[in-house]
Regions:
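ATP-binding/phosphotransfer module of carbohydrate and carboxylate kinases, centering on a glycine-rich
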Residues: 3-143
């Protein structure tokens, strides 16, 4: 929806791209401009590529994105104690470049119980963009 305070506004691909575009406007020297110019559009992959190439602007954008995502995931863990939090979509395809710092950022925000900090696994879906659709299709067979 794009409203302020909504998890999706900050911790989605749309949120990451919005943050990157805001940073690009303030930092014309950023590699984000070059990666966007090659394909014509900035996206999750190009933002992570610029970070991997050592661009401090892209690194700041990714770190901010991971912070927002970690806050939301920690709140989910604190409320529901899931065994697994599975991330899907294009940004989840970044693998451990996303997941390792995300796990590190989530851990201190999970309530003090050491069990909860290690019990919930944060994983990327192997089904890519179709994970939600496949899960929804399988739901009736599980009921």
């Amino acid at each position: 929806c794009g409203r302020k305070g909504c998890f999706e506004a900050y911790a989605s691909a749309t949120g990451l791209i919005r943050m990157a575009k805001e940073a690009m406007a303030q930092h014309p020297e950023s590699l984000l401009h070059a990666t966007a110019a090659e394909g014509g559009e900035v996206n999750g992959r190009t933002i992570f590529q610029a970070k991997e190439q050592g661009d401090p602007t892209a690194a700041a954008v990714v770190d901010r994105y991971i912070h927002y995502l970690a806050v939301g995931i920690a709140n989910i863990i604190n409320c529901f104690y899931p065994e697994v939090v599975a991330l899907s979509g294009g940004i989840a395809n970044q693998g451990e470049a996303l997941l390792a710092p995300l796990r590190e950022a989530v851990a201190p925000q999970v309530y003090g119980n050491q069990y909860l900090q290690t019990h919930t696994r944060i994983l990327g879906c192997t089904l890519g963009y179709h994970a939600g659709i496949i899960g929804a299709a399988m739901l009736p067979t599980a009921l």
